[in-house]
Amino acid sequence: MSILAYNGGCVVAMRGKDCVAIATDHRFGIQAQTISTDFKKVFHIGPRMFLGLTGLQTDILTVRDRLMFRKNLYETRENREMCPKPFSAMMSSFLYEHRFGPYFIEPVVAGLDPKTMEPFICNMDLIGCPNAPDDFVVAGTCAEQLYGMCETLWKPDLEPDQLFEVIAQSIVNAFDRDAMSGWGATVYIIEKDKITERTLKTRMD
């Protein structure tokens, strides 16, 4: 078994029309054993920016803390809010610094640019190779199932309500086909004037 799949979990982010969505499951386990059903994998790190991390639980918490430290240092030095693109570049550089002893995580960044309100999504591998497409990004143990669902349901210029429906159906149907993730999901819809958080109740097995 890959160390990335040891604790299970999944994250998916999608672009819409002037909005972006990010969703995650709730499971934290050790291989097939479920330890808790409320482990947080998506973190609110800016007014319109979220970071999702899947992989090894200890590395998720370590990387979250170290990236928050670097982000706060940047904002103190520059005296301005950090945008999703520079944050992704900083995270890519941080992960590549540790390429010979990497953190076993797959990060996903989703947010809106503070000036242009342009939606931005990005994911990386464990040594920080970035991928910023125009549609969706996935990470975690049910990535293959998520790719299939997202490719089927996603289309350009989805409104916030439509985007919620698409991302919710995608993640629920994907982790229902994966024993290492699931136990409910949380979806965040980021718009220029508000952030909506919704919790999905699903099969608890």
Swiss-Prot record:
UniProt cross-references to PROSITE patterns, sorted A to Z: PROTEASOME_BETA_1, PROTEASOME_BETA_2
A Pfam family reported for this protein in Swiss-Prot or TrEMBL: Proteasome
Annotated compartments: Cytoplasm; Nucleus
InterPro entries assigned to the protein according to its UniProt record, in alphabetical order: Ntn_hydrolases_N, Proteasome_beta_3, Proteasome_bsu_CS, Proteasome_sua/b, Proteasome_suB-type
N-terminal signal peptide: none
Gene3D superfamilies cross-referenced by the UniProt entry: Glutamine Phosphoribosylpyrophosphate, subunit 1, domain 1
SUPFAM superfamilies, A to Z: N-terminal nucleophile aminohydrolases (Ntn hydrolases)
GO biological process entries: proteasome-mediated ubiquitin-dependent protein catabolic process
GO CC annotation: cytosol; nucleoplasm; nucleus; proteasome complex; proteasome core complex; proteasome core complex, beta-subunit complex
Keywords noted in UniProt: Cytoplasm, Nucleus, Proteasome
Listed CDD domains: proteasome_beta_type_3
Subunit structure: The 26S proteasome consists of a 20S proteasome core and two 19S regulatory subunits. The 20S proteasome core is composed of 28 subunits that are arranged in four stacked rings, resulting in a barrel-shaped structure. The two end rings are each formed by seven alpha subunits, and the two central rings are each formed by seven beta subunits. The catalytic chamber with the active sites is on the inside of the barrel.
Function: Non-catalytic component of the proteasome, a multicatalytic proteinase complex which is characterized by its ability to cleave peptides with Arg, Phe, Tyr, Leu, and Glu adjacent to the leaving group at neutral or slightly basic pH. The proteasome has an ATP-dependent proteolytic activity.
Family designation: Belongs to the peptidase T1B family.
Full protein name: Proteasome subunit beta type-3
